[in-house]
Structures are given as C-alpha cells and as structure tokens.
Amino acid sequence: MKNKILKGSIIAFIFIICLMFITSGVSAETGSNNDTTIQTLSKGGLSITYPSTWGYSEATSNYSIMAISKLDSIDAAGVGQVNVNFEKQPLTTDFNTFINNTYKQMQYDSSFKLVSSGQSVIAGKPAFEYIYTSNDNGIEREHKAVWFEKGGQAYVIMYSAPLDQFESNLYVFDYIISDIQIT
C-alpha cells in the first residue's frame, strides 16, 4: 500500500512540475506579444487606432492630413516605405467625377496598373476602393485606396508598400478602416 502511495505521489509531483513548465512557457510567449499596444491619432476630421509597431511619419502629398508608417520602414527623411496616408481635397466637381478624373490622370503614368476597383463602405458611408500598382524610383509598389466624401471634401485613405511587403502588412490597413471614426 505504501508503495502505491509513493508511486502516486511521484507521478503527481512530476505532473505538477510539467504543468509549471507549460504555464511558464505560455506566459513567456504571451508576454512578447503584449508589447504591442493600440495607439490613437485624431486629425482633420478622422480618428484612427493602430498598433504601436507603427507611428506618425512624414507624408509626401500636399493634401495629407496625417500619415503613419511601420516603424522599421521609416527612412532618414522620416517617410515610411510601408505607410498609410490620409488625405483631404476640396471637391471641384461631384464626387464620382472627381474620383474618375483622378484615376484617368494616373493612367498617363506608364507604371500605373489598376488591379481592381469597386464600391465599399467606411464608417457607414459609401466609398470607392481602388487597388493598383506603380513604380516609384525603381521600387514596384502596391496601393489600396479607399475614397469617401464628407462636407464637400474628398477623403482618401491609402495604404502603400513595396510589392513584397504589401500582403504581410495589409491587416493593419484593414484594421484601421474597420475602426475609423469620421467626425
């Protein structure tokens, strides 16, 4: 009888030790993932949330309200190679004509290739979505732009990345679009 109790105690002890190792391993893994927090940025009538692995960056457009970039992609000039740019332009015509004219002008660039276009919704507002590629200083880039109208202004939220980084970072853009607040 003592032999069975001893064997049972040893098995229980080993089981408890194994559980402790498994638990500490899981805690270590989740600890490294918890380093990313959610940031908020509000400007120009838009409020967004994004992961802390991205940050505010310089934009190259005159119409830019704000821009965020993946932190490890920001160059010496402060411009991110993987970025989301938020722009606002006054409408000089109706919204549909404005969008069509914008993409007609872009077609004069021989590197511009429209991948897809269609209707979408952003924060409950009707929107247009365009996905296209272009060549910027020898770097092939893919872009996803979502356009909407508010108060006589055309807004565009555009994600841009080198082709080899586009898909792997697209989830951040999709998260921003799904959570954006238009004020």
Which residues are covered by each model-predicted region?
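N-terminal targeting sequences that direct proteins away from the cytosol to non-cytosolic compartments
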Residues: 2-78, 118-120, 136-140, 150-151, ...
